[in-house]
From Swiss-Prot:
GO molecular function: DNA binding; DNA-binding transcription factor activity
Top-rank taxon, per record: Bacteria
Protein name: Uncharacterized HTH-type transcriptional regulator MG101 homolog
UniProt keyword annotations, A-Z: DNA-binding, Transcription, Transcription regulation
Domain named HTH gntR-type: residues: 8-77
PROSITE patterns in the record: HTH_GNTR
Naturally occurring in which organism (per UniProt): Mycoplasma pneumoniae (strain ATCC 29342 / M129 / Subtype 1)
Cystine bridges: none
Length: 222
């Protein structure tokens, strides 16, 4: 009988396979992907695991299933820039993601990340920045992701949702936040949170910097 850990590993492989097919545009929007049976045979997996994975992808709007049409289809092409409305329990947000491939990690941010994990070389990391806006379209949060090109290319608008980031940020491998540091920007007094994420083998994947612009959470006399 397959162990829970082996089951999780197999699930990661299947997630990675499907996501890379979509990200590489080998399966563009509208493409019918492999059936449950085909995936079950290809990966020597159980039907229940395949259905769990497909249901998760359905919930993230990466694939769709239409009544009257057999099979699952790619819902949309995975682009690297967008203007996307998301919804949480209280506040609608408009999230704009811009690629900053020519921008490297600022020295001050590199020093902070290095203080968290000195074993990672942050010297040549590049970044993606996501700006989130409130219902009045006022910018209240900036998220910056730093890593190597092959890591950054997996990002899409859905990665701004925390659970999706954990599930899929690194080609389908489960990602865990292992280290975090909270501080205050000397000039703006905005709250800054620095996070490092690792895979389940404790290998560093990506760094994230969160800057909260909402004046209600600025630190006074810091």
């Amino acid at each position: 009988m397959i162990s829970a850990k082996e089951q999780a590993k197999k699930g990661q492989i299947i997630y990675r396979y499907i996501l890379l097919k979509i990200q590489s545009f080998k399966w563009p929007a509208g493409t019918r992907i492999f059936s449950e049976r085909q995936l079950e045979i290809r990966f020597a997996s159980s039907r229940s695991l395949i259905r769990t994975i497909l249901n998760t992808l359905l919930g993230k709007d990466l694939i769709r299933h239409t009544k009257g049409n057999a099979g699952y289809f790619v819902a949309k092409n995975a682009g690297f820039s967008f203007f996307h409305k998301t919804q949480d329990n209280k506040l609608p947000k408009w999230a704009k993601l811009s690629t900053l491939m020519k921008n490297h990690l600022r020295e001050v941010d590199r020093d902070v990340f290095s203080s968290i994990d000195s074993g990672v070389d942050f010297g040549n990391f590049k970044g993606l920045e996501a700006k989130l806006f409130d219902e009045n379209k006022k910018n209240f949060l900036n998220l910056s992701f730093f890593g190597k090109d092959d890591v950054l290319q997996i990002f899409s608008e859905q990665n701004l949702q925390e659970q999706f980031f954990k599930d899929f940020a690194y080609n389908g491998i489960v990602v865990e936040r292992k280290s975090s540091l909270i501080c205050v920007d000397d000039e703006t007094k905005n709250l800054l949170i620095y996070d490092l994420f690792y895979d389940d083998n404790n290998k560093f994947i990506v760094a994230m910097r969160s800057e909260y612009l909402n004046p209600r959470i600025k630190i006074i006399n810091a």
